[in-house]
C-alpha cells in the first residue's frame, strides 16, 4: 500500500493577477493547487464553471477560504448568528467551485466561553451538511485563537477539524 502524497498549495494572499495567471504560476512552481479567499478579485472575475475549467486545464486543486465578520479581524458587532449566516452563504457559493477543501476563519475571541461553545456546536452541525471537508483555521481575533485551550476544545468538540495558522 502506498503512502498518501502531500499536496502543496500556493496561497493567493496578496496576488493581483488573474486566476489563469495564478494557475500558470502555481503549475510552473510545481504546486498542486491554489488556496484562495472566496471573495478574491481573481475569482470574482469568473463564473463558477470558468473557475473550475481554469483549474482543471492547469491540473490544479483548490482550497477555498471563507472569512466571516467583515474581514480577517472581525467586526465586534457581528453576532454569532450573523457569522453562521455568512458561513452558510459562503459554503453554498464555495460548493459550486468543487474545492478539495474549505477553510473557515470565523467567530470572535470577544465572545464568552459559553457563547463560543454554543457557536461551535451550531457551526459544526452546519458544516456536517456539506460533502466537502471543512476545517476551521486557528487565527488571531477568532474563536480558535488560543492554542493553550485547544486540547480542551477538541475534546469537547470531537468533530472539529483544524487548519493551523502558524503566523
Where are these regions (language model features)?
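Short, exposed beta-strand "edge-strand" segments with a Pro/Gly-rich flavor and a Y/T-containing core
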Residues: 14-17, 41-46, 142-145, 157-159, ...
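Active-site metal-binding loops of divalent metal-dependent hydrolases
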Residues: 166
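N-terminal pre-domain/capping segments
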Residues: 1-89
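Conserved beta-strand positions in the central sheet of alpha/beta enzyme cores
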Residues: 35, 63, 102-103, 163
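Active-site acidic/histidine proton-transfer and metal-coordination neighborhood
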Residues: 76-162
Amino acid at each position: 500500500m502506498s503512502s498518501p502524497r502531500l499536496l502543496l498549495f500556493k496561497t493567493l494572499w496578496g496576488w493581483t493577477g488573474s486566476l489563469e495567471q495564478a494557475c500558470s504560476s502555481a503549475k510552473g512552481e510545481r504546486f498542486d493547487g491554489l488556496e484562495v479567499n472566496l471573495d478574491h478579485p481573481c475569482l470574482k472575475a469568473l463564473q463558477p464553471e470558468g473557475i473550475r475549467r481554469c483549474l482543471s486545464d492547469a491540473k490544479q486543486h483548490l482550497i477555498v477560504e471563507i472569512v466571516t465578520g467583515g474581514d480577517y479581524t472581525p467586526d465586534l458587532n457581528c453576532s454569532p448568528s450573523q457569522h453562521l449566516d455568512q458561513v452558510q452563504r459562503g459554503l453554498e457559493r464555495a460548493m459550486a467551485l468543487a474545492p478539495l477543501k474549505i477553510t473557515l476563519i470565523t467567530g470572535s475571541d470577544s465572545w464568552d466561553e459559553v457563547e463560543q461553545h454554543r457557536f461551535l456546536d451550531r457551526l459544526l452541525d452546519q458544516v456536517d451538511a456539506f460533502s466537502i471537508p471543512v476545517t476551521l483555521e486557528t487565527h488571531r481575533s477568532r474563536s480558535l485563537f488560543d492554542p493553550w485551550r485547544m486540547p480542551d476544545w477538541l475534546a469537547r468538540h470531537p468533530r472539529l477539524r483544524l487548519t493551523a495558522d502558524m503566523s
